[in-house]
Amino acid sequence: MKQNKYEIDMCNGTIMDKLISFSLPLMLSGILQLMFNAVDIIVVGRFSGSQALAAVGSTTALINVFTNLFIGISLGANVLAARFYAAGKDREMSDTVHTAVTLALVSGIVMAFVGLIFSRWALELMGTPDDVIGQSALYMKIYFLGMPFFMLYNYGAAILRAVGDTKRPLIFLVISGIVNAVLNLILVIMFHMDVAGVAIATVISQLISCILVLRCLRTSKTSYQLHFGKLRINTVYLKQIFQVGIPAGIQSTVINLSNALLQSSVNSFGSTAMAGYTAANNIFGFLYVAVNSVTQACMSFTSQNYGVHKFKRMDRVLVDCLIISIVTSFSLGCGAYFFGSEILKIYTADPEVIRCGLEILSYTTVPYFLCGIMDLFPGALRGMGHSGVPMILSVIGTVGTRIVWIFGIFPHHRSLAVLFISYPASWMLTIIMQVTCFYFVRRKVHRV
């Protein structure tokens, strides 16, 4: 299997340096994606006021609920493509690529219609205050118009990650990120378009990243080359993509439903707390990118080595990923804790908003390494093709704990601090269940 200069050989050689080489561009890519939203938040917070800031921020959990099922399914495409590519199965690899891209296009169009029709209703269901709901609904509707571009980019990038290429998606996001930032400044500051301006800028930047990743696949002279005339659904491979991807997507969607429920609890404190949570939640996003990039590496490396039956190497991959994840997330979490006030001032100058954001960060940043551990074991299991049970355990541990917390504890001790202690509590419980599940699945693999 001949590899180009962008690809990483996951099945041979040292592991730690290759994991870092794979994870670092992926981490930077995730940071750039978050910066789309961060720039939106910073620009509206600074130039359109706290109500506009709350309007944009209140849509985050809902957008994630709508999109994460399909983004989760892209993990199934990643796992299947990695397995076929490592095994040198060119025809199967090509069919997987064309099935994945077709699925991305269809799901993106569906999500665009869903967002346009149900955005305001969903915001009302969450109890979004009257003073921001109009702007929130406008932002969501424009954002969802770009959903086909968003989906095509993410599925295309999943294919590239499957073959060990995380550098080109990073380059594409650098280009689209610069465009997004420039358009934000032009549309909001010069043309005073407020939330509509930042939404339009995001859609245009997503279109650019979509075009770049599709061009990359189209011009590739490999088994994953894209031919538009071959775009169709292969039901055999679609089923295999769904077997891994749907549980991952359901898990992500349900967890974001719990976050939407938590957003509703934050909404009960008013627009100031909402703005503080918006800024703090954006910081969480940067922390999660660090742990998720290692999880993605673990899944891709595990899948390729599983495809060529290098089971002992899979174990070393998991151990090295745990080391990278814990060190990275703990360091970043401590940084966010100690410099939280300075970071929050980037988003807003309102002292009350900063106070609310600091209260949230105080209970969630230092223990964030637990979130990394919690995600790694399901990532390794998905790499081996097991996705259903990890999904159930994550829903029970994460969502169940937060629901019990929100309805059982929070009403009797109403404060942002009490509300957000539910995060580390849910991470700890889920880790215990996921490690137990991994132990039994891994024993079965040893006997294969």
What are these regions (language model features)?
Residues 1-23, 81-146, 190-246, 302-367, ...:
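Short alpha-helical transmembrane segments in multi-pass integral membrane proteins
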Residues 35-54, 123-130, 186-193, 253-286, ...:
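Helix-terminus/linker motif at the lipid-water interface of multi-pass membrane proteins
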Residues 74, 143-161, 169-180, 198-213, ...:
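Short runs within selected transmembrane alpha-helices of multi-pass transporters and secretion channels
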Residues 22, 26-34, 71, 103-112, ...:
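Hydrophobic alpha-helical transmembrane segments in multi-pass membrane proteins
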Residues 12, 16-35, 39, 62-69, ...:
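Residue-level signal for short hydrophobic patches within transmembrane helices
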Residues 53-113, 150-169, 276-334, 338-340, ...:
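Small-residue-rich hydrophobic transmembrane alpha-helices
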Residues 65-68, 180-185, 210-214, 286-289, ...:
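Hydrophobic transmembrane alpha-helices of multi-pass small-molecule transporters
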Residues 21-40, 142, 176, 205-209, ...:
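Transmembrane helical elements of multi-pass membrane transporters/channels
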